[in-house]
Structure formats: structure tokens, C-alpha cells
């Protein structure tokens, strides 16, 4: 990384560092330089007018051609219409979020809040500090006959005659590449666009106890939170009621994603396809992983390369767990060895450029073949997954998937003599002994977040009724830890999970990840082919 400030100081970055001044008390003590300015202490930056003038001239004109509309634009407009219908007469403020600091002056790659992406259709790294505002109108006078007009406020491309072009390492074109123009992003999204300098007025105008009610997707952009909190307080708005309204807004925006539209399903298919390619890369890399002290990192790296090649990023931290590490549900350190004879549990997903992610798990024999005990445990988990999938159809309740999978696992555990009670008692609310070896849920919604729709009401999620267009995982598992004295020694250190991404259709379900081998025989043949 170049030796320059990732975060520009309060002064312009081409100014020389401030010179400390002697204290006013006559002691000669030096006032400390403000910390915010010390980012400039490591670099010499030109401050001459000649430099500024030279930087501002001699550039070819930027293209004025406008991009085509995004394929997501009409779908995003329908989602905004649903928000408008739910909250007539109220201003809705949905920030994208801000750049997050990894350490010191180094940021993480930007990833917008999922609600912002859902309502704008924007993916990849669009757009730090942006805010979508839905302004109430008279009934039917808004966009496409809705009750709101939508405007996207963001920081557009700066002219090459400005200091931002070359001096702002967070947003300047010289540092991070071209940014969209107001007209360009309007063409892509179908939204009105405006610069961030207009945001404060748009968010705060007419806010009063008897004025325009404002709903905010809170805890997404701290500056917007602070701005609206100050205005609400000054205007005498009931802060408790406003906080409850904000929570209801987050809830609704989460529930709006429970059923995916055709464009969303298409993007999730792309995420699944890229993820399957990543699993194939891992199988090819397994011989190299076996020869490395931290073979799990070899596995993780092989998958990450595919995620960046075909997608935006990982949908979540990869779980590459070999041997006893596979009994740790969210093992993401991936510092362990990958040893012959062990099982490798790989739980990974590619996030598409649209920000939709897959979430798939396979448990693979490192040596290419399952032992008898590994196969026995694997088949129990596979049977549970198949049983849950078999009942998926519109009209059943989401919670039934878990119950069906648990019935199968309890039957197998009972048959192996592992339960200290009868199968009937184990399945009762007062029992649940089987959850010692399967402590997590069987399913979760999937989409823009790996655990999508997380703020939805219980009656629409766990107790909800399945509808066509819902996408969720089915992922039972069994985990027998090395130190578990309640199971035979031959079971210890074995963890198995099988996870697929399921789309509810009009008359049943489709396993979006079914092309990835699932049975022990299929897995062994697949691995042999890829490693030949």
C-alpha cells in the first residue's frame, strides 16, 4: 500500500504538517499536535499553487455516455412501492452505511446494508455514505403512482479540477478509481439523485412533534443517527415512540425479503453455481492441504480465490474444519491440519456482485473414501436432510422442517444406543437429549444476508407458512467431540453437516445446490474424478 493517508486529515492533505507552538504559560511547553493531523506526519505533500494548477489541467474529458438501466431497477422499484404502501405519509430514511475501519487508517472493503441494496438494486461496493430517502407525497402522486418520491443521496464523482480528485484517499478518483456521476447512477437505478450536501435538509425538514414523521433504519450510519436524534430532540418528538417506529421499519424491511422475486432467484442461482465451483477447487487443492501444517487455510484460500473471481466476496467467513474441528459449529480460525483419514467439513458461500449469497456445506473424506463409521454417521445426516426436503411445499410451517429432520436423527441415535431415554422422550419438549449432538437449527432464510430476514417477527419466520419464492437452507448435522464420553470411541472426533439451498416452488421445492454430490458414493466418485 502506498505511503499516504487512508483517512484525510481535517486540513487539506497537501498542506504541510502543523508546527507545534510554545505554550501560552511561558514555560516553553509545546502544545501537542492534534491526533487527527498526525496522519500527515509520514508524508511530504506538495502545497504550492503551481502544483494545484498543474493537477487541475491537461485531462481528457470524461465520457458523458450514460449506462444502461440495471436489470435490478424495476424490481427495486416494486420493493420501494411496498415500503411506500406500508408507511404512507412518513419519510423513510435508509442509509447504505459507512466505511468501516479494519485498523488504524485501513478500511474494510465496503459492503452496503442489505436493506439499502434491496431497495436500490445496487451491489458490489456501492455506495459508502449514501442514503436513500423516500419523501411522502399526496396519495398517488409519488413514483409510479405510489405515495412517495425516492431520492438517492451520495458522493458523486469529483471533477479533476478539485482537490478531492487527487487528495482524498477514501473517495478520490486518483486513489480508488472512478465513481458514478449523479446522472450515471440515476440512469442505472431509475432514482432521483443528489449530492450529500443536500442530505441534511432532506432528512430534517419539517420534523416536529406535529410535523412530518420520520422513520430511520437506525444503527447503519452513525452520522445520520446523530443528525436525526438531534433534530427529534430539538423538535420535541417523542423519542421512545420514534425508536419504536425505527424498530418497526427495520422489521418490515427484513420481512420484505422473505419472498424472493425472479431477479433475486436468478442471482442466488449464480451464487450457488460459483460456490459449487469453489467446492471443486477445494477438492483439487486437498492434496496440497494435506501437506501443510495449516491445511485448513489452504482449503479456505482455494475457496476464497473462487469467491473473488466469480463474485464480490465471501458471503460469510469460510468454515474449513478438519477432524475434531468439524465438531465446532463455527470454526473459522482454520488453523488446523488436514490429515488423511479425517473428514473435512466445508461450510462456504460465494456472495454474488449483487450481494446475494449461497450457503452450502459438504463433509468430505480427506483420503477420498469414507470409513464405515464415517459413512454410517453421514447417512444418518443425509437421511435427515432428505426427510426435511421431502415435506417442503407451500402451506407448511417453517418449523416443521426442523421437526422432520430431528425425528430421523433421533431414530438413528436411538438405534445406535446413544440416547439415555426413549426416542419419544427425547423428542418431547421435556427431553431433547439428542440436541447434545445437534444443537443448532435445521434451516434459516437465505438471500442478501447468510442469515437473511433476521429481524422478521417470529410468526412470519419460525412459525411462518412457506410461500413460493422463499429460499432457505436445510442443514442437519451430527457432532461427536473427541472428549464426549457419552458416545463410543469410534464416533469421537467426527462432525458431519450437509447443507443445501432450497427454493419453494408453486407445487413443491427445488434444491438449488443439488448438482453438488450429496451421497457418499457420489462424493467419492466426484473427488476421484477431480483429483485424477
Language-model segments: residues:
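Active-site neighborhoods and metal-handling regions in enzymes and metal-associated proteins
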Residues: 1-532
Amino acid at each position: 500500500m502506498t505511503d499516504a493517508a487512508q483517512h484525510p486529515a481535517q486540513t487539506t492533505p497537501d498542506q504541510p504538517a502543523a508546527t507545534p507552538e510554545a505554550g501560552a504559560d511561558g514555560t516553553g511547553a509545546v502544545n501537542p499536535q492534534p491526533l487527527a493531523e498526525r496522519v500527515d506526519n509520514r508524508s511530504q505533500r506538495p502545497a504550492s499553487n503551481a502544483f494545484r494548477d498543474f493537477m487541475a489541467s491537461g485531462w481528457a474529458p470524461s465520457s458523458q455516455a450514460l449506462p444502461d438501466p440495471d436489470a435490478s431497477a424495476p424490481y427495486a422499484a416494486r420493493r420501494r412501492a411496498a415500503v411506500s404502501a406500508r408507511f404512507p405519509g412518513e419519510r423513510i430514511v435508509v442509509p447504505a452505511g459507512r466505511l468501516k475501519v479494519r485498523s488504524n487508517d485501513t478500511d474494510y472493503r465496503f459492503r452496503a446494508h442489505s436493506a439499502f441494496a434491496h431497495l436500490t438494486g445496487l451491489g458490489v461496493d456501492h455506495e459508502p455514505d449514501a442514503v436513500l430517502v423516500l419523501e411522502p407525497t399526496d396519495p398517488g402522486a409519488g413514483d409510479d403512482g405510489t405515495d412517495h418520491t425516492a431520492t438517492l443521496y451520495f458522493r458523486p464523482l469529483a471533477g479533476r479540477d478539485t482537490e478531492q480528485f487527487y487528495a482524498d484517499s477514501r473517495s478520490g478518483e486518483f486513489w480508488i478509481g472512478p465513481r458514478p456521476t449523479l446522472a450515471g447512477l440515476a440512469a442505472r437505478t431509475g432514482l432521483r439523485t443528489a449530492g450529500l450536501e443536500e442530505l441534511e435538509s432532506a432528512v430534517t425538514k419539517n420534523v416536529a412533534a406535529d410535523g412530518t414523521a420520520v422513520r430511520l433504519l437506525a444503527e447503519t450510519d452513525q452520522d445520520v443517527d446523530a443528525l436525526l436524534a438531534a433534530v427529534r430532540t430539538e423538535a420535541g418528538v417523542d423519542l421512545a415512540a420514534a425508536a419504536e417506529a425505527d424498530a418497526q421499519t427495520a422489521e418490515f424491511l427484513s420481512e420484505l425479503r422473505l419472498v424472493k422475486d425472479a431477479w433475486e432467484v436468478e442471482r442466488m442461482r449464480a451464487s450457488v453455481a460459483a460456490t459449487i465451483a469453489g467446492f471443486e477447487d477445494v477438492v483439487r487443492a486437498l492434496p496440497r492441504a494435506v501437506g501443510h501444517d495449516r491445511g485448513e487455510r489452504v482449503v479456505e484460500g482455494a475457496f476464497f480465490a473462487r469467491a473473488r473471481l466469480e463474485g464480490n466476496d465471501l458471503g460469510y467467513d469460510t468454515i474449513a474444519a478438519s477432524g475434531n474441528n468439524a465438531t465446532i459449529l463455527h470454526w473459522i480460525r482454520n488453523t488446523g491440519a488436514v490429515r488423511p483419514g479425517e473428514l473435512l467439513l466445508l461450510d462456504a458461500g460465494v456472495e454474488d456482485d449483487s450481494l446475494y449469497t449461497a450457503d452450502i456445506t459438504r463433509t468430505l473424506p480427506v483420503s477420498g473414501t469414507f470409513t464405515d463409521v464415517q459413512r454410517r454417521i453421514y447417512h444418518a445426516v443425509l437421511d435427515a436432510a432428505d426427510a426435511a426436503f421431502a415435506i417442503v411445499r407451500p402451506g407448511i410451517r417453517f418449523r416443521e422442517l426442523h421437526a422432520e429432520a430431528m425425528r430421523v436423527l433421533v431414530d438413528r441415535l436411538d438405534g445406535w444406543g446413544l440416547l439415555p431415554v426413549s426416542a419419544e422422550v427425547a423428542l418431547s419438549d421435556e427431553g431433547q437429549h439428542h440436541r447434545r449432538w445437534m444443537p443448532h437449527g435445521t434451516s434459516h432464510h437465505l438471500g442478501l444476508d447468510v442469515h437473511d430476514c433476521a429481524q422478521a417477527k417470529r410468526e412470519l419466520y419460525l412459525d411462518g407458512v412457506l410461500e413460493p419464492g422463499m429460499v432457505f437452507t436445510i442443514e442437519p448435522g451430527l457432532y461427536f467431540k473427541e472428549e464426549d464420553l457419552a458416545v463410543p470411541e469410534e464416533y469421537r472426533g467426527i462432525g458431519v453437516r450437509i447443507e443445501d439451498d432450497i427454493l419453494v416452488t408453486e407445487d413443491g421445492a427445488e434444491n438449488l445446490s443439488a448438482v453438488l454430490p450429496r451421497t457418499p458414493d457420489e462424493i467419492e466418485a466426484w473427488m476421484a474424478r477431480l483429483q485424477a
